[in-house]
Each structure stands twice: as structure tokens, then as C-alpha cells.
């Protein structure tokens, strides 16, 4: 097929990733919440973890008002604020009828939906435990050009690695904005731009994190850290 985004539904509310012309893996596929209720995005990701490209183990929701994608990925304590500037998270609930993009690991994988993912009262918080987890140390690196802003997140935890941590390191789905900032995997040369990167605390004073900025030639940008 010459359709860059294609696929079909299967019995049992599954979705098989279709072909992407000249793409090595399953490519980007457009899915949506098939339920008449909200859907628990975290549970959907957990159930289908092996079907995602490991650099993009997330759901990407397009923010039409601002013209960029927000992501839903593994929750990191202290960094799940859906109200932050471009490059931020979307939260953990996908409302009925809401579409989202996924990067399939290869052609033919199946993304499964089941009724246990349904959430009927979105006003209630998702309670994972009785205690509140301590926020991970880290920063939100912001770049600004004129009135345009973009952000990338870097966090630290002893369970993370300098290499890829699927679901915690989140690839960037870019819309080509006026200004954009991202990082790359710290321990090797990678071509995947990340909107969020998780690293170990040990050795944090010596690790070098590649940071990239896309903007108009000659533009003057301002950096800040939150």
C-alpha cells in the first residue's frame, strides 16, 4: 500500500499495525479510545509494551490549539503536569473518542484494548499506592525564541541507565515548530531525539547529555531551567 498510515481492526478490539512505505519498523499509526468512557492510558501502554518501538513507548496526543504533541508515558513522580509548555505530558486519561499516535515496533503487531482499561470517573485520581512517591530529581530545560517556547525534561533515578530506558526515555514526535529543544541518549551516538530522558543518579556529575535546538538560522534564543 502507498498509504503512509494504515492498519485494520481485529476481533476482540485489537489493532494491527499496517505498512509504512520505506519504514524499517511498524511506523506511526493513528489509534483512538474505542470506549464510551475514558481510558487508562498507563494500563494500555503496560498491556502493549512490547508492541511499541522502544524509543517511543508512549501515546502522543495532538494539541490542536497550540500545534504540537503531548505525550503519555510511564509516570515519573513530580513530572506529570499536563499544563506545562510544549513538550509536556498529557496526563494519564484518554477521553472517549480521543485519537492518539503510536509508533509500532514492526509491521503486524497488535495493539489490544480491553474493558479493564475503562475509567468511569475521571474526577478521581489514580491511586497507585497509599503513600505519595517522592518526586525524582531533575529539570525541565526550556528554550524561548520571541513568544515561542519549547521544553525537554531530564530526570534522575537509581533504577535508570545511561542507555535506553523504554517508557522513561521518550522519543520526540515533532511538528516542526519555530523553536524546539531535545536531548539524545547520553552514552552513545543516537539519531533519536528525546523529549524526556531518564538517567541514573550515580555519576551525574560526569555524564554528558547531548542537547539539540532547532530554530531559524541566526535566531537568538534564551535558555532557562525549571
Indicate residue ranges for each PLM-predicted region.
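Compositionally biased Ser/Thr/Gly- and acidic/asparagine-rich
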Residues: 2-226
Amino acid at each position: 500500500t502507498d498509504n503512509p498510515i494504515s492498519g485494520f481492526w481485529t476481533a476482540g478490539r485489537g489493532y494491527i499495525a499496517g505498512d509504512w512505505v520505506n519504514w524499517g519498523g511498524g511506523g506511526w499509526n493513528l489509534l483512538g479510545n474505542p470506549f464510551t468512557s475514558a481510558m487508562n492510558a498507563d494500563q494500555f501502554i503496560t498491556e502493549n509494551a512490547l508492541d511499541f518501538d522502544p524509543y517511543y513507548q508512549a501515546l502522543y496526543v495532538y494539541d490542536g490549539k497550540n500545534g504540537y504533541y503531548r505525550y503519555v508515558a510511564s509516570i515519573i513522580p513530580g513530572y506529570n503536569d499536563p499544563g506545562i509548555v510544549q513538550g509536556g505530558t498529557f496526563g494519564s486519561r484518554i477521553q472517549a473518542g480521543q485519537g492518539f499516535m503510536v509508533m509500532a515496533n514492526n509491521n503486524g503487531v497488535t495493539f489490544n484494548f480491553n474493558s479493564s482499561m475503562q475509567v468511569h470517573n475521571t474526577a478521581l485520581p489514580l491511586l497507585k499506592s497509599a503513600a505519595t512517591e517522592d518526586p525524582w530529581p531533575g529539570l525541565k530545560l526550556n528554550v524561548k525564541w520571541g513568544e515561542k517556547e519549547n521544553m525537554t525534561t531530564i530526570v534522575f533515578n537509581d533504577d535508570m541507565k545511561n542507555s535506553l530506558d523504554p517508557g522513561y526515555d521518550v522519543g520526540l514526535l515533532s511538528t516542526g515548530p519555530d523553536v524546539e529543544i531535545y536531548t539524545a541518549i547520553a552514552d552513545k551516538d543516537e539519531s533519536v531525539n528525546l523529549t524526556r530522558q531518564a538517567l541514573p543518579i550515580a555519576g551525574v556529575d560526569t555524564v554528558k547529555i547531548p542537547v539539540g535546538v532547532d530554530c531559524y538560522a541566526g535566531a537568538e534564543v534564551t535558555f532557562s531551567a525549571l
